[in-house]
Amino acid sequence: MLIFDHSRPGRTAAAQLPATGGDLGDLPAELRRKDAPALPEVSELDVVRHYTRLSQKNFSIDTQFYPLGSCTMKYNPRACNSLAMLPQFLARHPASPDETGQGFLASMFELQEMLKDVTGMAGVSMAPMAGAHGEFAGVAMIRAYHDAKGDAARREIIVPDAAHGTNPATATMCGYTVKEIPTDATGAVDLAALKAAVGPQTAGLMLTNPSTLGVFEKTIAEIQKIVHDAGGLLYYDGANLNAILGKVRPGDMGFDVIHMNLHKTFSTPHGGGGPGAGPVGVSGRLLPFMPIPLVLNDNGFYRLATEADLPQSIGRMSANMGNAGVLMRAYVYARLLGREGMHRVAEYATLNANYLMAKLREAGFDLAYPTRRASHEFIVTLKKLKDATGVSAMDFAKRLLDYGYHAPTTYFPLLVPECLLIEPTETESRETLDGFVDAMKTIKHEAETNPDLVKGAPYTLPVRRLDDVKAARELDLAYKPAA
């Protein structure tokens, strides 16, 4: 039921805010609304009950364990939210003079420096407004670098078959041809295939380390040498940065550019369509091409860099410098943790993943890469279970909802059949992990003894099996009031 379904003509709530607008007589007649907007007419109690009910139907970090692999669904401390919302930070207009925003700009400069430190990069720009936006900026800088050298023949980006789907999409948007290389039996990049793929046409390699398979690329030193010797650059997808936060730095591995998903690693909000933040870090060779604005420190005076400071910049990613409220949350989180706290994030995230992986192995679940240690997430494959019972990974995931757990990522990465990609993050307790293992064991037993029970799940939610194809093909995102 939508809020509009509660609407009744003339029903109103007391205004919570003062009226604004005043006299509109100075507006041209063609810009003035002639009809009342199609807004619901409801009481305050209707609104409170409606949205409270909706919140109770949602799965969220506040209420359930959320082991959504490669999404790092950690708990975001409330302090980060409350401190970042202080009006002293957010009241500044983005077009106001730098002199009037020294506190905010100083905070943003410190965040840039902390991100540089934790990633080992030479420079950071926080202009991109989402992870994919930062990814686009990173590949655009690779292109600008090669174009500046007159190396127009480099029009190929290499992408492993375990990469995030945004990687080939971004490369294509930036005008590159994508060349896919396989993963070997241990989940690592196939070095022989990489050597065969590089050449004078290679602009770069896009890599996630640890990978989406949950394993660390132990041959990263050799990988970066192969790519750099061929004249290409190395791109780091920061999706799994939480696993190595400050312990191992992409810059030290030889990466030339990285985008960071602050919603995964630095305690900013997930989902909802935004706002977001996707800062990019670069090695020395890409410093001239960073997107603007970024914050400069001129002998204690903080200011936003412009085209005059970076004439080779790829330009502006948005009207202003990212989303201020999101960046402030990341700043508070980084200050609360400090360098040692960030190290503990990586340690506990890895510990939780390996504990959960070991417990599920003991319970009889098959691991996609049983000889490898989990970095932050791992893959369970249910292929044997499906062959024996007909219960698929999707069925298993739906049944988990009945036990109060959000399902892990299903059917991704694509190269592992009937897979569950599980990432517990550092903020979950051992008791929570043990409860999840118990639910997994119970569902496995149900699949083996009463498979139809699992195939019919979920039973406890207001909606059950949705038509995903219809939802994707027949978009209906707007409310249309009845005539």
Curated annotation (Swiss-Prot):
Recorded superkingdom: Bacteria
Transmembrane segments: none
Top-rank EC class of the record's enzyme: oxidoreductase
One GO term (biological process): glycine decarboxylation via glycine cleavage system
Pfam families: Aminotran_5 (PF00266), GcvP2_C (PF21478)
Role this protein plays: The glycine cleavage system catalyzes the degradation of glycine. The P protein binds the alpha-amino group of glycine through its pyridoxal phosphate cofactor; CO(2) is released and the remaining methylamine moiety is then transferred to the lipoamide cofactor of the H protein.
GO cellular component: cytosol; glycine cleavage complex
Reaction equation(s) it catalyzes: N(6)-[(R)-lipoyl]-L-lysyl-[glycine-cleavage complex H protein] + glycine + H(+) = N(6)-[(R)-S(8)-aminomethyldihydrolipoyl]-L-lysyl-[glycine-cleavage complex H protein] + CO2
Family of the protein in this entry: Belongs to the GcvP family. C-terminal subunit subfamily.
GO molecular function, one term: pyridoxal phosphate binding
Species assigned in the record: Thiobacillus denitrificans (strain ATCC 25259 / T1)
Residue ranges of the region described as Disordered: 1-24
Subunit structure as annotated in this protein's UniProt entry: The glycine cleavage system is composed of four proteins: P, T, L and H. In this organism, the P 'protein' is a heterodimer of two subunits.
Name of the protein: Probable glycine dehydrogenase (decarboxylating) subunit 2
Keywords, comma-separated and alphabetical: Oxidoreductase, Pyridoxal phosphate
Gene from which this protein is expressed: gcvPB
Residues with the N6-(pyridoxal phosphate)lysine modification: K264
Keyword Chloroplast: no
EC annotation from Swiss-Prot or TrEMBL: 1.4.4.2
Keyword 4Fe-4S appears in the UniProt entry: no
Essential cofactor(s): pyridoxal 5'-phosphate
